[in-house]
């Protein structure tokens, strides 16, 4: 039981007016450690008990059983709890040493399936830093949910269908050359895509041709299909190379095209329930009762839209995986689309539509400007990762020129730096892409956390220390206490990150833990012979375990030496 739950239970025994959960949510952490470790504000009881909060705090502090605390005291309208440092540090260190990487593991999910719709790059377009967010946020959410006992199923919903393929086919037939494309597929296809978009602005006829070619593709025309398959195969070679560098893998590559033969069922259900209405030759579903505009299901030319395919996708996933959560990690600009999708599925009678969650995220910009594939204004991810690794290697060679496996460590640090920087940003916020800031060993960065972990491993090697599960390690100084409280809160942070679908909670926790350890390291002579030496080393060991596991949840490696 974590200390906040323990305190909430003890307060509930003397405050029947509030339930344990309400009390738990009211508990605060004082800004000044002199005011205790946990505080309960008595304001909420003033109306009920018809007394001043200060008086209530004083009376309750007297009634609470203080035997398991260092002390309990009222300060103004607050009841302040000072925890027993020695006994809690003993419990926490014992738990981490015993459970190791399983520390913080929970069984909330009990093997239930969570599907993650993620990454979803567009075929025939370069993999840019814009795709990074969906990829790494969803991968981290997958690790976090697995830590809670769920079975995380990662699905790459490739952008391999849509009018853009009509555009690309028209561009290729007008200006393309097979040998040129095969020599450098993504770059050449991007040139064609940018050119057709620019020319279509001046010549709307090209747009119409693109629509016709996409309709041919939907109807199974051989020439259209062969070109599409070729574009797809060439693109996947590059994508898989990048996923290997990112150390991200998928359980399924089900692109939009996978659902082409699965859309009729959804449309049939809409027809059977008389939900389809005609509007200007197109077919729509009225969503007025959800305060949403009508959902366009089929265009007047019979071509389907994203929502039609996403209906089929959701139905397939529910039937195949029986998910308890179907999570879509997709940018904020798709928010309206997912509201409509959920509403249409609800109208179709699928209660599981409530389990569909759109996890949105903010934009990545460069010099505060939006990136756009259509305008050719993008940052390619692969050369960016290579540059990050190169910068990491330069810093490693300066710090530790004799390090073995320098290239492997540089890869872990460089790629980890890019991922960590993305993940430490509050999910709903965007960020400006700054490689220099990402790869810095100072500040709130991935390399800073990795370097702290490697520093601890160096201390443990010097001391030749391996903790003993039977030894009662405990500490009661202020510096170690800050670390102990963080270690104790690891499981609660994992739960909160899952509840909010936000890995930045884990990234910020890792930064805070690394900072607390480095303060401890600066003020404590860990290796000096003393009664507390082994307990201090046990604290180092426990910190390293939790730092490494925090990084793993984010999909970032923790090198043993740097």
Swiss-Prot record:
Catalytic activity: tRNA(Arg) + L-arginine + ATP = L-arginyl-tRNA(Arg) + AMP + diphosphate
SMART domains for the chain: Arg_tRNA_synt_N, DALR_1
Major place of residence: cytoplasm
GO biological process: arginyl-tRNA aminoacylation
Coiled-coil regions, chain positions: none
GO cellular component: cytoplasm
Localisation per UniProt entry: Cytoplasm
Motif 'HIGH' region per UniProt: ranges: 121-131
Keywords: Aminoacyl-tRNA synthetase, ATP-binding, Cytoplasm, Ligase, Nucleotide-binding, Protein biosynthesis
Enzyme Commission number, as recorded: 6.1.1.19
GO molecular function: arginine-tRNA ligase activity; ATP binding
InterPro entries: Arg-tRNA-ligase, Arg-tRNA-synth_N, Arg-tRNA-synth_N_sf, ArgRS_core, DALR_anticod-bd, Rossmann-like_a/b/a_fold, tRNAsynth_Ia_anticodon-bd
UniProt enzyme class: ligase
PANTHER family, A to Z: ARGININE--TRNA LIGASE, CYTOPLASMIC (PTHR11956:SF5), ARGINYL-TRNA SYNTHETASE (PTHR11956)
Family classification: Belongs to the class-I aminoacyl-tRNA synthetase family.
Subunit comment: Monomer.
Name assigned to this protein: Arginine--tRNA ligase
Organism: Streptococcus uberis (strain ATCC BAA-854 / 0140J)
Gene encoding the protein: argS
